[in-house]
């Protein structure tokens, strides 16, 4: 922690106290307190983060010090601002970008996000005199985690290995379409004892730019590579996928061998965008009807009804044959997902699995939670540009509920993978 204070001749200079002092991992909470204020002093706390492309994310909240001139965000409710009430991590999850339709993304996991925290005198909207300042670093790689770029055959990926010699249970991590290679979820999970491969599948290096056809053999090659790695347990791998990555998780579990466990975050059970192909089998894309795209009062597109119902007519051919799978599934669902009908897809997948005598999957539904369920304390992305439909679309979610869901989902998926990949049986109740 680096703390800077503005001297006040009438009392000790206010100081921001952060624990842990030296920064922490991005999925961990930070304890924020202020000392040296006047008794009952009104102050405004402000947080600022600059992302890798220079966009600023900000939040602020109004507080009142206690009778000793101290302020502890774990005990003191915010009186208003970006959030209100007792929210110890609100200055992080309530951040909003200064650019429209901007999502917080971490490309270089070897450097931290840096958050500047300021204490301002009073409750004025424009902020009073700055009383104290601190800098907090949020890291993406735990000490000892190793980052290994993978360019093996066609596979374009990055493997993150925990400290030690292993072997460790392996997980393949997939993001949505157009993401390229995103590593921040894999790097954090590697700190929990998993060997995690962040796998790109389009829009990266020499991989296809479009998604006209997806060959599952590419993903099979990635599974083979991971299972053959000397530091990965060889019995089977897990798959973690969100959005299009969740849909691909369904496909891998349905067509490929050695997929022991899959966590699907807001994924589709029908194939979307282009043909899905494995050997001599082809699953066509579900149809769309652009007339069903709605407009919000702000002029943004709401595409939740864009896709045809995969249970009707010729669109039934777009269904991924999940009933073939012997994989253990966990479905994490944002009930306010406006990208597509994630809860419907999860429940339909569950019906099809059970109708074929397969294990009932675990479904956890999070109210007021949108499409992009990230690791804990990432701010909600309310809307951003969607290259497939053109222009900005809404993703759904309310900031506080979405933030609480991210904390719970992160714990749930870790527990699920430990149970199914390395035999550490335990359960945690969903908190929502």
From Swiss-Prot:
GO terms for biological process: acyl-CoA metabolic process; long-chain fatty acid metabolic process; saturated monocarboxylic acid metabolic process; unsaturated monocarboxylic acid metabolic process; very long-chain fatty acid metabolic process. The keyword Zinc-finger does not apply. A motif (Microbody targeting signal) lies at residues 430-432. It catalyses: hexadecanoyl-CoA + H2O = hexadecanoate + CoA + H(+); decanoyl-CoA + H2O = decanoate + CoA + H(+); dodecanoyl-CoA + H2O = dodecanoate + CoA + H(+); tetradecanoyl-CoA + H2O = tetradecanoate + CoA + H(+). Pathway: Lipid metabolism; fatty acid metabolism. Its EC number is 3.1.2.2. PANTHER family: ACYL-COENZYME A THIOESTERASE 1-RELATED, ACYL-COENZYME A THIOESTERASE-RELATED. Catalyzes the hydrolysis of acyl-CoAs into free fatty acids and coenzyme A (CoASH), regulating their respective intracellular levels. Mainly active on long-chain acyl-CoAs. May have a function in termination of beta-oxidation of fatty acids. This is Acyl-coenzyme A thioesterase 3. It comes from Mus musculus.
């Amino acid at each position: 922690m680096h703390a800077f204070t503005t001297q006040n001749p009438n009392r000790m200079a206010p100081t921001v106290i952060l624990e842990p002092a030296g920064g922490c991992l991005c999925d961990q909470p930070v304890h924020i307190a202020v000392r040296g204020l006047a008794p009952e002093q009104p102050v405004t706390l402000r947080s600022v983060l600059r992302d890798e492309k220079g966009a600023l994310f900000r939040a602020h909240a109004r507080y009142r010090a206690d009778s000793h001139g101290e302020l502890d965000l774990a005990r003191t409710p915010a009186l208003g601002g970006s959030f209100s009430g007792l929210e110890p991590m609100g200055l992080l999850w309530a951040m909003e970008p200064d650019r429209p339709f901007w999502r917080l993304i971490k490309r270089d996991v070897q450097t931290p996000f840096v958050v500047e925290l300021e204490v301002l005198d009073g409750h004025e909207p424009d902020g009073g005199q700055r009383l104290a300042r601190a800098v907090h670093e949020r890291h993406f790689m735990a000490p000892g985690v190793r980052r290994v770029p993978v360019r093996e055959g066609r596979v374009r990926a990055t493997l993150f290995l925990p400290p030690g010699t292993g072997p460790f249970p392996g997980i393949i991590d997939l993001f949505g379409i157009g993401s390229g290679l995103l590593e921040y979820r894999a790097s954090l999970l590697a700190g929990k004892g998993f060997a995690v491969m962040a796998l790109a599948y389009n829009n990266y290096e020499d991989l296809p730019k479009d998604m006209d056809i997806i060959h599952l053999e590419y993903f099979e090659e990635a599974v083979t590579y991971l299972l053959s790695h000397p530091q990965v347990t060889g019995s089977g791998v897990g798959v973690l996928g969100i959005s299009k990555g969740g849909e691909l998780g369904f496909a891998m579990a349905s067509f490929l061998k050695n997929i022991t466990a899959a966590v699907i975050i807001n994924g589709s059970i029908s194939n979307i965008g282009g043909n899905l192909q494995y050997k001599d089998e082809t699953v066509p894309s579900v149809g769309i009807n652009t007339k069903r795209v709605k407009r919000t009062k702000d002029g943004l597109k709401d595409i939740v009804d864009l896709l045809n119902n995969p249970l009707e007519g010729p669109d039934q051919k777009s269904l991924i044959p999940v009933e073939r799978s012997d994989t253990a599934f966990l479905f994490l669902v944002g009930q306010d997902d406006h990208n597509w009908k994630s809860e419907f897809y999860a429940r339909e997948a569950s019906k099809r699995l059970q109708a074929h005598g397969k294990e009932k999957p675990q479904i956890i539904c999070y109210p007021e939670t949108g499409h992009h369920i990230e690791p804990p304390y990432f701010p909600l992305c309310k809307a951003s540009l969607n290259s497939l439909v053109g222009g900005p679309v809404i993703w759904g979610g309310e900031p506080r509920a979405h933030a609480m869901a991210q904390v719970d989902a992160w714990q749930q998926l870790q527990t699920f993978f430990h149970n199914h990949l390395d035999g550490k049986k335990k359960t945690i109740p969903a908190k929502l």
